[in-house]
C-alpha cells in the first residue's frame, strides 16, 4: 500500500502521485482527451456538489446495490476507463479487474488499456465492459 492512511481526499492522492510518479506518467494520468474541455466541465460541476452526511442518523439495513442493463452490482458506482494503468503501477489492470470482481462493481476498460479486454474478462469475469474510443484520425 502507498501509505493510504495519509490520503483522505482526492487532492491528497493527486499530490502524492505527483511526488512519486515520473512526470511523463503523472501528466498522462492527469490529462484527458483533446483540449480537456469535458474534464474541465466535469470538475466545475463536481465542485458545485456538496454531500452532507447523516451523522448519527439511524439507517437500518442500507441498500447500496443497483442494476444497469439487467446486471446487478453491489454498489452504485464502478471503475472508469483509464488508459495505460500499468505505466503507473505494473499489474494495475489485473488489480483493477480483481477489485471489481471482489466488490461486484462494473469496470469499464479503455481502448488505450495496458491489457486486452480478454485479460480483463479472465481476471474479473463479467465485471469488464469496454469503452470504444474512436479517433477520426484513423477512420
What does each model-identified segment do?
Residues 90, 109-124:
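Active-site-adjacent beta->alpha loops and helix N-cap segments on the catalytic face
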Residues 77-80, 107-109, 128-132:
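Hydrophobic faces of well-ordered beta-strands that scaffold small-molecule active sites
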Residues 22, 79, 100:
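Conserved, mostly hydrophobic/aromatic
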Residues 94-98, 118:
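Alpha-helical segments flanking ligand/cofactor-binding loops in enzyme cores
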Residues 137-139:
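Conserved small/polar residues in nucleotide/adenosyl-binding loops
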Residues 2-70:
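An N-cap/entry alpha-helix motif that binds or orients negatively charged groups
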Residues 82-84, 112, 133-135:
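Active-site beta-loop-alpha junctions enriched in small/polar residues
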